Amino acid sequence: MKIKKILLTSALILSTYSAIAQTQVIAHRGYWKTDGSAQNSIAALLKADSIGCYGSEFDVWLTADDKLVVNHDPIFKLKSMERSTAATLTSLKLDNGEQLPTLEQYLKAAKKTKTQLILELKAHSRPERETLAVEKIVNMVKKLGLEKRMEYITFSLHATKEFIRLAPAGTPVFYLDGKLTPKELKEMGCAGPDYHLSVFQRHPEWIKECHDLGLKVNAWTVNKPKDMKWLIEKNIDFITTNEPILLQEKVRN
């Protein structure tokens, strides 16, 4: 009986460890490659949550009138994100018929979900605009009670440092640009690298180095099964993909 209990306990421990160590799936711009969805739409967020993604990634800009909107490209339907007002931008339609959302609309919809919110602040034309954007994002997230579900990513080194400075202690902040070593990221206070797949193909040793330093590792945008398999075998923490269902299958297998 004692042996059975020991074996059962060991199995439970191993099972728990396995679940913790399992690579997590992040839907790139939400789950948009499905009916009724579009990149960076509220539908894409809800659909990412509905299929059980760990996280749903989305992109944020600060408009000319200091409002926050959700969109990827600097120009959408001939309108500049930085040079247009929020009223102009939110009048534009996404591919699924939704209007381009404000960050507030997006986050309010997110309150109905459980998925982690992976917010990418786009690199802006001036550092002071990025600082203002970070301040507004952090304040809005606090107001909506979503601090524990937020993770921040950005290509801007300045914005990375501002998120680390202004977000609550312990909030994961990842750098996207692929230029810093694990040691440099650790010294800066980052949660880890969120680099393009090609960076880890050049520096596969960085994944273990990050883990040895207590950092987490994310790779983007990984859509091919062979690349998913390679990263999973390297024990990467997160993979960002346009093919979340395919990646979920690879993680399970």
Predicted features along the sequence, with ranges:
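Phosphate-group recognition and catalysis centered on beta-loop-alpha active-site segments
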Residues: I20-N253
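Bacterial Sec-dependent N-terminal signal peptides
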Residues: M1-Q24
